[in-house]
Amino acid sequence: MMNNMKLLIIAVMIISAALLPALVVGSRPVKCDNCMDGGEKEEIMKMSSGVDVSHRILQAKRFIDYEALKKNLPAKPDGKPDKPDNKYRRGCSAATGCYRFTN
């Protein structure tokens, strides 16, 4: 019975966090080096939803994490899945960076 109550409380908290707007108390300056407005400090006030807050946080990052890069891998031209590389016998090609252009 106690486990069901804990599960119910967690589910209600998750649903309420997703549906209700997030309130950011006060404001905080965010410095952005590569912003379109010249990198001026921007004041983050009350946001209308949690999605807006997460977008602002992602805009202030200086790097792209590896998980974001993994999800956008280009497909092979023939549509077949990629085979794992054999690091001992993978050969030399333009893709591996050791290929020499002799033309």
From Swiss-Prot:
Keywords: Disulfide bond, Hormone, Secreted, Signal. Residues 33-58 form a propeptide. Its main location: secreted. Coiled coil: none annotated. InterPro entries: RALF. It is found in: Secreted. The record marks 55-56 as: Required for proteolytic cleavage. The keyword Signal applies. One of its GO terms (cellular component) is apoplast. Proteolytically cleaved, probably by S1P, a subtilisin-like serine protease (subtilase). Disulfide bonds join 92-98. Residues 1-32 form the signal peptide. GO terms for biological process: calcium-mediated signaling; cell-cell signaling; regulation of growth. GO terms for molecular function: hormone activity. It holds the Pfam family RALF. Cell signaling peptide that may regulate plant stress, growth, and development. Mediates a rapid alkalinization of extracellular space by mediating a transient increase in the cytoplasmic Ca(2+) concentration leading to a calcium-dependent signaling events through a cell surface receptor and a concomitant activation of some intracellular mitogen-activated protein kinases. Belongs to the plant rapid alkalinization factor (RALF) family. This is Protein RALF-like 18. It comes from Arabidopsis thaliana (Mouse-ear cress).
